[in-house]
């Protein structure tokens, strides 16, 4: 039974490193994979008004992996880390060539983490009743 949390923890850390690499690369690796052009940003899904849907989905997945990987004692730290890294990575775009800071990306990051946070709190609330 301990293999599942270990596996999800490994996947979480690999996904985290992968996301950091995608964020910090000066250009779009996904754009290169899809369009053959590092300059073109990939639009995998349509945005939600002023919120980047790609960022929402990326941080939902990362948050879910984190929730399934860590114990309740570390969940608070996990969410603080996810909120911090979502801000820090987007701010890094100010300094990275061919990248730019965008509020829609930052809001997408926040929304992805926040949705999982709310779902976890609702689950914990109903489980304790």
Regions found by a protein language model. Give the residues of each.
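Bulky hydrophobic segments
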Residues: 1-97, 101-104, 110, 114-129
């Amino acid at each position: 039974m301990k293999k599942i949390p270990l596996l999800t923890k490994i996947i979480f850390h690999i996904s985290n490193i992968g996301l950091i690499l995608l964020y910090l690369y000066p250009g779009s690796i996904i754009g290169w994979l899809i369009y053959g052009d590092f300059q073109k940003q990939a639009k995998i899904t349509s945005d939600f008004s002023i919120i980047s849907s790609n960022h929402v989905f990326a941080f939902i997945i990362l948050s879910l992996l984190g929730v399934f990987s860590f114990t309740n004692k570390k969940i608070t730290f996990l969410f603080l880390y996810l909120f911090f890294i979502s801000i820090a990575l987007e701010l890094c775009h100010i300094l990275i060539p061919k990248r730019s800071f965008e509020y829609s990306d930052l809001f997408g990051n926040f929304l992805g983490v926040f949705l999982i946070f709310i779902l976890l709190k609702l689950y914990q609330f109903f489980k304790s009743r």
